[in-house]
Regions:
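Active-site segments of SGNH/GDSL-like serine hydrolases
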Residues: 170-174, 189-222
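N-terminal secretory targeting modules
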Residues: 1-113, 122, 134, 250, ...
Length: 275
C-alpha cells in the first residue's frame, strides 16, 4: 500500500480533519468560501480515516454537517454549530479512547500461539514470530498460513490445547482485500473467537487498517472484542509498521526490516504477560 493509503487506513487523518472542520465552524458567515472549503476538507479527512461505526452513524454525522453548511432559515446558526461541534467531539472522543495501546492483563506466560496469514507465516525471509522467539526468549507456536482468512483460522484454533494460555490473532486482511462481505467476515470472526476465547486464556487481536468500503470490518472487530474480552491493538500501530522505510517487500508483505519492527511491536504490546 502507498504511504498515502496507509495514512488514511491507519485512521490518522481523523485529527487534521477535526481541525479543518472546527476551523470551518468558527469561520464567520461573511467568509462563505473559507467556511465551506474548510468544512468539506475536514469532512473528507474524517470520513477517510474510517472510524469504525455503523453506516447509520455516518448518515447522521453527514446529515448534521449538511444542516450546518446549508442551514435552513428556521434553524439558528448557534443551534447548527452546536450540533456539529457535539458530533465532532463525540467522534473524536471515541477514537481517542481507541488510540492507545491497551494494557494487556492476564497470567504471565513463556509461550505464545499465533494465528495469522502470510504476514505472520513469512514469505521469503525470517518471519516476525521467528525473530520474536529469539529476541524475547519465548516459545512460539506459529499456526499462521499464507492466504488464510477468518474461516481458515477456525482450523488453526482447533490445534490449540488447554496449555495454550496466550493467543495473538493477526487475521482478516485477506478477507478484506479479497472482497469477503462484511457480514460473512463478522460471522467468521465470531465463530473464531467463540472457539479461541477459552477460560484462562488471554487473547489479543490486531485491528485491521481500513478502507471506506470495509468500515464494517472494523466495527465488527471492536464489537466482538468487547463481547469476548479480547485485547485489541489499535490499527495505527500495525499501519506504522507497514509504512516504515523498507518495511515491505511488495507494499504489503513484510521484509526483514518490517518483520523486525513487527516483532518489536508485539514484544512491547505483550510485555505485561510475557516472561
Amino acid at each position: 500500500m502507498s504511504p498515502a493509503a496507509l495514512y488514511f487506513a491507519s485512521g490518522e487523518s481523523l485529527y487534521p480533519g477535526v481541525v479543518f472542520l472546527l476551523l470551518g465552524v468558527m469561520a464567520p458567515e461573511r467568509w462563505p468560501v473559507l467556511r465551506s472549503l474548510s468544512g468539506w476538507i475536514g469532512l473528507i479527512l474524517m470520513v477517510g480515516a474510517c472510524p469504525p461505526a455503523p453506516w447509520w452513524a455516518y448518515g447522521i454525522f453527514v446529515g448534521i454537517f449538511l444542516l450546518w453548511l446549508f442551514r435552513p432559515k428556521k434553524l439558528s446558526r448557534a443551534a447548527a454549530t452546536m450540533m456539529l461541534a457535539m458530533a465532532v467531539f463525540l467522534v473524536l472522543g471515541t477514537e481517542l479512547s481507541q488510540r492507545k495501546m491497551p494494557v494487556i492483563a492476564g497470567g504471565t506466560e513463556h509461550s505464545l500461539v499465533i494465528i495469522g496469514d502470510s504476514l505472520s507465516s513469512g514469505i521469503g525471509g525470517p518471519s516476525w514470530p521467528t525473530i520474536l522467539e529469539h529476541s524475547a526468549g519465548i516459545s512460539i507456536k506459529n499456526l499462521s498460513r499464507p492466504g488464510a482468512g477468518v474461516r481458515d483460522a477456525l482450523a488453526m484454533a482447533a490445534q490449540m490445547t488447554r496449555e495454550d494460555h496466550l493467543l495473538l490473532l493477526e487475521i482478516g486482511g485477506n478477507d478484506l482485500l479479497g472482497g469477503v462481505p462484511s457480514a460473512d467476515f463478522a460471522n467468521g470472526l465470531e465463530g473464531l473467537l467463540m472457539k479461541a476465547c477459552a477460560p484462562g486464556r488471554t487473547v489479543v487481536m490486531f485491528e485491521l487498517p481500513l478502507i471506506p468500503s470495509k468500515i464494517a470490518y472494523g466495527y465488527s472487530q471492536r464489537r466482538l472484542a468487547r463481547k469476548y474480552h479480547v485485547f485489541l491493538i489499535p490499527k495505527r500501530f500495525f499501519a506504522d509498521v507497514l509504512r516504515g522505510p523498507h518495511a515491505t517487500s511488495d507494499g504489503l508483505h513484510l521484509s526483514k526490516v518490517g518483520a523486525s519492527r513487527m516483532a518489536a511491536l508485539v514484544e512491547q504490546a505483550l510485555s505485561p504477560v510475557l516472561q
